[in-house]
A protein has these predicted regions:
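An amphipathic alpha-helical interaction segment
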Residues: 2-96
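Basic/polar phosphate-binding segments, predominantly the helix-turn-helix DNA-binding elements
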Residues: 60, 64-70, 89-140, 145, ...
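Short helix-capping/turn signature of helix-turn-helix
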Residues: 148-149
Length: 187
């Protein structure tokens, strides 16, 4: 048995982490066995570059463990959504183009599904409706941009799909419980 945790560098990895399973139980995956063995050997050795090698091995171990936990057996979340080839197309479009004024019909078309089938399938797989996920993704991107303090609130609003700073400020305040300006100052 191997236990561990990951500390994600992104200050707002909460959305993605909340959509990952808390526990991944894997059996009979040879690649994982090899990686676990390598992690054990490297952690016992006192060689130069040990920390760098361990960091990379553990990153690969995480990816392989998550890959093995996808599909219908996975709990609702991002992995299950990405494991569905049709939903994955829509998710990648949302992630790649958060400023686009997506509609349910457009996302369903990307997934080659009817609106009702897309809504049902997405909600069942990801654990939340598509437009709720899109809002959460946009707010996650906005928080990251605000933390950097490189853009005005209006520029952040434009990058995450809002036509005006005031509309964005209202949506952000409702979602986050504070204004974008205040959020940026606190970081």
């Amino acid at each position: 048995m191997l236990g561990g945790y990951f500390d994600f560098a992104s200050p707002d990895a909460s959305l993605l982490v909340s959509l990952l399973p808390a526990l991944v139980h894997v059996r009979g995956v040879e690649r994982l066995s090899v990686l676990v063995r390598l992690v054990g050997e490297e952690s016992r050795a006192q060689r130069s570059g040990r920390e760098l090698v361990l960091t990379r091995l553990v990153e690969v171990l995480l990816v392989e463990a998550l890959r093995s936990a996808h599909g219908d057996d996975a709990p609702p979340g991002l992995l299950r959504g990405l494991a569905d080839a049709r939903l994955a197309v829509a998710i990648r479009h949302m992630h790649g183009h958060p400023a686009r004024p997506w509609t349910m019909a457009q996302l369903a078309k990307k997934a080659a599904l009817s609106r009702s089938a897309f809504f049902e399938r997405f909600t069942r797989a990801v654990g939340m409706p598509p437009m709720e996920y899109l809002l959460a993704w946009r707010m996650s991107v906005a928080k990251d941009l605000l933390r950097r303090n490189e853009l005005s609130v209006a520029e952040v609003a434009e990058r995450v799909g809002y036509g005006s700073a005031s509309t964005f400020s209202t949506a952000f305040s409702r979602y986050e419980g504070q204004s974008p300006g205040r959020f940026a100052r606190q970081r």
